Amino acid sequence: LVYKIIKLEYDENRIVITGYSIGSGIASYLAATNHPKMLILQAPYYNLVDLMQQKMPFVPTFILKYKLENNRYLKSCHCPIYLFHGKEDTIIPFQSSQKLQKECNTVSQLILLDDLGHNGMNENFMYQSEIEKILNDRRI
């Protein structure tokens, strides 16, 4: 609903979708079902079932109402995709982003951040520098 409202005010070629951690699933879905300028994912998981099996194997995955399959959504994206992940992330390992990049059917870039865990990415100097460069290069 929010994306539809934003589209009333802005052309999609000016909209950047971003999602952090669990929010990467919603962001990927929005990018796959719309035409934003780009998609930026921070510490994304491969898909929610995969994440649950890694972190909580004792919980049956059929209880998930929403599967939130980043791996599936990224195949349908038509915009550039930027994946950021901390190398020290113990909640969602950076290998998740490496697997996701292989699913992208469009221009994608994986930026691994040294000495960064799952939290604090927005405050990380390297992340800020890379985001500034990406936004300037894409004229946002």
Go through the PLM ranges and name each one.
Residues 1-9, 72:
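Alpha/beta-hydrolase active-site loop
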Residues 98-119:
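Catalytic histidine neighborhood in serine/cysteine hydrolases
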Residues 91, 116-128:
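Catalytic histidine-centered segment of alpha/beta-hydrolase-like enzymes
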Residues 70, 79, 93-102, 127:
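Short alpha-helix in the alpha/beta-hydrolase fold that links the catalytic acid
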Residues 24-79, 125:
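Hydrolase active-site cap/lid region
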Residues 10-21:
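Alpha/beta-hydrolase fold nucleophile elbow
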